Amino acid sequence: MKQLTILGSTGSIGVSSLAVIKANPDKFTVRALSAGYNVKLMLEQCLTFQPTYASMADEASATALRQQLAEYGCKTEVLAGVQAACELAALDGVDQVMAAIVGAAGLLPTLAAIHAGKQVLLANKESLVTCGRLFMDAVEQSDAQLLPIDSEHNAIFQSLPEQIQRQLGYASLSKHGVERIILTGSGGPFRETPVSALADMTPDQACAHPNWSMGRKISVDSATMMNKGLEYIEARWLFNASAEQMEVIIHPQSVIHSMVRYRDGSVLAQLGSPDMRTPIAHAMAYPERVASGAKALDFCQIGALTFLAPDYARYPCLQLAIDACNHGQSATTTLNAANEIAVAAFLQSQIRFTDIAAVNQHVIEQLTLPEPTSVDDVLFIDSWARQVAAQTLTHYVR
């Protein structure tokens, strides 16, 4: 029986993770849950899974949860703040930590799990986008194990030899015959929208992903393909891949979740329904297999799989991310922070869809900070970029 802490339990990945746990009660149990401000859903989760601990982002949310749990006679101990999330990530007796807090807020709790030597199911892209080398060094030093949850990275992981799976971030791809990692993306809801019409796209249109069910921030990132850009950066770190060993292609059906091309001409791919329960169940049970509840693929119903090269005029955020990755950790941290501010403004209808890339590019162009050598450096760059992005928004506000 594996004991888990779920960081970000009320988000999309957290909810899917709990669904997999519920489907396999003989294999997994919840020790702790951590979330932001969604007291209503956290209450339901605590009553269903009876964790020993739960934490909320602030004291007001924690107090509200405490009072409601007391009414139901639930004995879950409720904590508050980032430090509480870090403590739950490092709890003795916890085998796995699902790191699913969206954004830079997930950085410190995820690192706490790494430093505690946990098996970390990594769904928080920002840990690698903002901390890269620092993060991978911490993994090596603490003897923690990373298992990727993003459907693309999980697909790549499954398509790689076991020797690389056991040495994520350090194994040589070429030594094991790997020629190229092929990252696939659907192209989002605006793949066929005229470029001239993109400025008029609304938040609701951007969040209507054709294949996946996701949170609103990640849905917008999918529409701009910034999501794929962040995944590109993450893949470079996770799989120790050079720019020459990476390729991004658009695959509208989202059936092939990513591929690995080998030296002998073979291409291994992982296919499945667009359901996050599949990679979650794979990582939770690794190296075994358990039921995820995901619908089986019907190849006859799919009919055809298609592919095309990304159009960088349509997806400038993807190009920005690739360029930032080649530039260094300061640039990727800056881009990630600026993008969070820009997307939040778009979701509140303060700026236009096409302004997201413009804001991101402007902030990147202001960057003169050196490469980070500590987490504090990363957090400083992150804070600086958010301030510059917020100032930049004033030029674009509708």
Swiss-Prot record:
Pfam families: DXP_redisom_C, DXP_reductoisom, DXPR_C
UniProt KW Membrane keyword: no
Binding, NADPH: 10-13, 36, 38, 124, 126, 215
Cofactor(s) listed in the protein's UniProt record: Mg(2+); Mn(2+)
Catalysis: reaction(s): 2-C-methyl-D-erythritol 4-phosphate + NADP(+) = 1-deoxy-D-xylulose 5-phosphate + NADPH + H(+)
EC number from the UniProt entry: 1.1.1.267
Involved pathway(s): Isoprenoid biosynthesis; isopentenyl diphosphate biosynthesis via DXP pathway; isopentenyl diphosphate from 1-deoxy-D-xylulose 5-phosphate: step 1/6
Domain of life: Bacteria
Binding site for Mn(2+): 150, 152, 231
GO molecular function: 1-deoxy-D-xylulose-5-phosphate reductoisomerase activity; manganese ion binding; NADPH binding
UniProt xrefs under InterPro entries: DXP_reductoisomerase, DXP_reductoisomerase_C, DXP_reductoisomerase_N, DXPR_C, DXPR_C_sf, NAD(P)-bd_dom_sf
First-tier enzyme category under EC: oxidoreductase
Keyword Ligase: no
This protein's UniProt keywords: Isoprene biosynthesis, Manganese, Metal-binding, NADP, Oxidoreductase
Residues reported in the UniProt entry to bind 1-deoxy-D-xylulose 5-phosphate: 125, 151-152, 186, 209, 222, 227-228, 231
Any single GO BP term: isopentenyl diphosphate biosynthetic process, methylerythritol 4-phosphate pathway involved in terpenoid biosynthetic process
Biological role: Catalyzes the NADPH-dependent rearrangement and reduction of 1-deoxy-D-xylulose-5-phosphate (DXP) to 2-C-methyl-D-erythritol 4-phosphate (MEP).
Protein family: Belongs to the DXR family.
HAMAP family: DXP_reductoisom
Subunit structure: Homodimer.
The protein's name in its UniProt record: 1-deoxy-D-xylulose 5-phosphate reductoisomerase
Source organism per UniProt: Pectobacterium atrosepticum (strain SCRI 1043 / ATCC BAA-672)
The organism's taxonomic lineage, starting at the top: Bacteria, Pseudomonadati, Pseudomonadota, Gammaproteobacteria, Enterobacterales
